[in-house]
Amino acid sequence: MISREQAREFGLAQRNQLKRAGLQDIPKRRFDPLEVLRAACKDHVPKLLPVKFERMRESPFAFFRGAVEVMAADLGAQRYTRIEVQLCGDAHLKNFGFFATPGSDIVLDINDFDATTRGPWEWDVKRCATSIVLAGRVAGDSNAACKEAARIFLRDYSAWIERFTDMPSLEVARHRALRDYRDPFIRVALKQAERATPLSNLKKLTRRPGRHGYRFISERNLIWEVSGTERKSVLAALPSYRTTLAPDRQMIFDRYRPADVGFKVVGTGSVGTRDYVVLLFGRDLHDPLFLQIKEEPPCAYASYYKDRGAPRNQGQRVVQGQRAMQVFSDLLLGWCSISGRDYLVRQLSDHKSSIEPEELNGGRLAEYSRVCAELLAKGHARSGEPVALASYLGRSGKAVRALLQFAVKYADQTESDYEAFQKALRRGFAKKALKSAGRKANHTPRERSSRPRPSSQLVPEESVPSSETDTAKAAESGS
């Protein structure tokens, strides 16, 4: 624990480590971004990679979402400050959303922490500001409007960091972004969160064949039923997951019993990772619970910044990062391991929804950017030293101007990467990535048909897209 004066001096000293004008710099690359992307996919489920790439090719913003490893490599090659916070790691507009608190209030906050780690504060800010520019361009906003929205985000982030320096630590820890969401577009997302309940998921994701209870609907919303040894391995991990819950949460979990296990395709960046869903019931069939068991690979920033306090289990890393940045976290948030892989466990789509950034046109983009600025600043102030950060930023606007220049230049670079990605797909990039992933992945059931099926076998052969038509349908259905 350092004093306020020590924190102020440390922040000012960081201007020697990285001048504020240097925040705009983007060094010339010494790597091929497509090779970085392909390397990141090597441990993915091979036949789901076409779905991932199909989603990434929708727009430069979608590509940006699916290529966090590329930006991590760019950021890791730059000079950075030593002002450390808990990073979201993948701070873009789509990763802010509504969800229910343990007390059933609906709140808006950062909601994705797959890439969370301790690291330099500016990495989150640069990624989020870039996402604002890209989202605005995809929505049809002018370059001037996109730049202005990013400027508002950066200005408000700095202002909130300054405000947090005058708040008691407990007040910072409890801070909630309170808004009267009058915009019809945002209110639609809020209403969706209110309607997304376990009972609504039961109707949407499952069927009830006769007297055999509820089962996941195969292929609908890209969920497939899991059976055999694979199912047993997933269920066998639940007792270990239970130990990661607080005693009062364990009592809640103990009221439920598993009924079915499925495999789900999720998101854009996460497509290809292993993701299970478990349906459980409490006292009767009107008391369902859906758990998502989501594979967590090593952090995208691990090669560029050493988080000395990071736990070995990647699911635990995500849980700890989420709790550090959020005021409220999922009631049943925990972690486990299955067949040597680490997983995050949480409720599936319980009162959750998010804004579609591509539709944030006009004044909506700027207004939503203000909310995101407050939420990101809150997460950084909770987990870092706001006095040091405010001292570094100052009040002259130098840091804001430099970061704005970075956001515009990096958005331009992302669009160039997107064009290169499109060309690479036409030249067989997907096949090369599939081949690389196939060398590292387990054999398919067909290849192992004469041997006992191992617990690490993840997706039945018939469950994954096997043709361009199937892939297109999968991509259109979303997550």
How would you label these PLM feature ranges?
Residues 9, 208-211, 226, 278, ...:
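Intrinsically disordered, low-complexity segments enriched in small/polar residues
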Residues 176-237:
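Long, low-complexity segments enriched in small/aliphatic residues
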Residues 448-479:
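Long, low-complexity, intrinsically disordered segments
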Residues 2-88, 93-191, 243-451:
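Conserved ATP-binding subdomain of kinase catalytic cores across diverse folds
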